[in-house]
């Protein structure tokens, strides 16, 4: 099987599964922080995960080394929205820096706006 010359090879991730930094820089609890506690084998959770929040530059360098041309990421709304009317500047800064790093590496960022990562405050109000 061959792929068209313009086929875009990429990789993907989900914020909760890779970012870690679960209580840093203004991130508030999300539904996965609550739902995964005590329900995953060996008590695993996303507190540290792959530590992408702190290691995103290394991760992007690895993607570039692999020849990845596109990267689909998701937004952690608990990192971006600390309350109903409160945007977390540090959360926005993280995603801005990540997108800049991807672009500098020649990797096309593709953002999934919602990948089931709802802040607990929104869940407790019945959702968005």
Predicted regions and their residues:
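N-terminal carbohydrate-binding accessory modules
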Residues: 1-66
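Substrate-binding cleft and catalytic face of glycoside hydrolase catalytic domains
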Residues: 60-128
């Amino acid at each position: 099987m061959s792929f068209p010359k313009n086929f875009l090879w990429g990789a993907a991730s989900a914020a909760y599964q890779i970012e870690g930094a679960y209580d840093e820089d203004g991130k508030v609890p999300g539904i996965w922080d609550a739902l995964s506690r005590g329900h995953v084998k060996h008590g695993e959770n996303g507190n540290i995960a792959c530590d992408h929040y702190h290691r995103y530059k290394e991760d992007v360098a690895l993607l570039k080394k692999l020849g990845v041309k596109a990267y689909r990421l998701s937004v952690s709304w608990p990192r971006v929205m600390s309350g109903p009317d409160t945007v977390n500047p540090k959360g926005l800064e993280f995603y801005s820096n990540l997108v800049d790093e991807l672009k500098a590496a020649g990797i096309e960022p593709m953002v999934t706006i919602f990948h089931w990562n709802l802040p607990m405050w929104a869940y407790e109000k019945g959702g968005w």
